[in-house]
Design a protein with these regions (language model features):
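Mid-domain alpha/beta scaffold segments of enzyme catalytic cores
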Residues: 1-255
Length: 255
């Protein structure tokens, strides 16, 4: 069975019914997933979905591209969401220097607050690092980091990977690891210790081969797993077992 460690169900449900989405996921052997929030409203919706569907857990946080919305009020609302058992992670937070929607200092300030929330609630920090991996690692190295870190949709260099692993982080790979041009990601996947490896869809974005060009969904995480298995010269079933066990461990789930 597979575990999708990062999907945006609040976006997916704009185009498909969640019941259909979950049925296709089950058909593809996906039995658990984490619905990721990117601002207060989507974090609240992710919790609603998790309460309605036992196979879903959720996260709460504000994406760096929305960091201008971060305030004492939004932090208080995220803090309250994190008190719920169904909310198993803080984020998606981090830094995004690619789109540059938000001043870097504003992103960094919001990221630092999320770091403290993760420490306070003892929940893993889900980190977005588009064109900003080194800067995000620097922020974590400058403080006592949370004990559980997840670098989502890994895209960093080999040196950055070593630094992230030195922090004790888990590394999550998305559908782009299956792209023909992504040999650098497959190289990274080979270097990650088995007990730190996660997979995700980042639905509805980054659909893996052979679904590339379609809206992504949790059921496609098996294709991500197959790409990882091929890159690591491992059995697909072993990758499914390992990544599912890792996800359940870092999110604090019994099963």
């Amino acid at each position: 069975m597979w575990f999708d460690s990062h999907c945006h169900l609040h976006i997916c449900e704009q185009d498909v019914t969640l019941d259909d989405l979950f049925a296709r996921a089950r058909t593809n052997g996906v039995d658990q997933m984490v619905a990721i929030g990117i601002e207060v409203a989507s974090s609240e919706r992710a919790l609603e979905i998790a309460r309605e569907h036992p196979e879903v857990y959720s996260s709460a946080g504000v994406h760096p591209n929305d960091a201008t919305s971060w305030s004492e009020q939004s932090e208080e609302r995220i803090d309250k969401l994190l008190a719920h058992d169904e909310v198993v992670a803080v984020g998606e937070t981090g830094l995004d220097f690619y789109r540059d929607y938000t001043p870097h200092d504003v992103q960094r300030a919001a990221f630092r607050d999320h770091i403290e929330l993760a420490k306070r609630h003892r929940k893993p920090l889900v980190i977005h690092t588009r064109d900003s991996t080194s800067a995000a690692i620097e922020e974590l190295e400058a403080v006592e980091p949370p004990s559980k870190l997840i670098f989502h949709c890994w895209s960093g260099t080999t040196g950055e990977l070593r630094r992230a692993l030195d922090l004790g982080a888990h590394i999550s790979f998305a559908g782009n690891v299956s792209f023909k041009s992504a040999e650098n990601l497959r190289d990274a996947a080979r270097l990650v210790p088995a007990d730190r490896l996660l997979i995700e869809t980042d639905s509805p974005f980054l659909a893996p081969v052979p679904h590339r060009g379609k809206p992504n969904e949790p059921g496609f995480v098996a294709a991500v797993g197959r790409a990882i298995a091929e890159a690591r010269s491992e059995d697909e079933a072993d990758v499914a077992l390992t990544t599912t066990a890792n996800a359940r461990q870092i999110f604090g789930l019994a099963r």
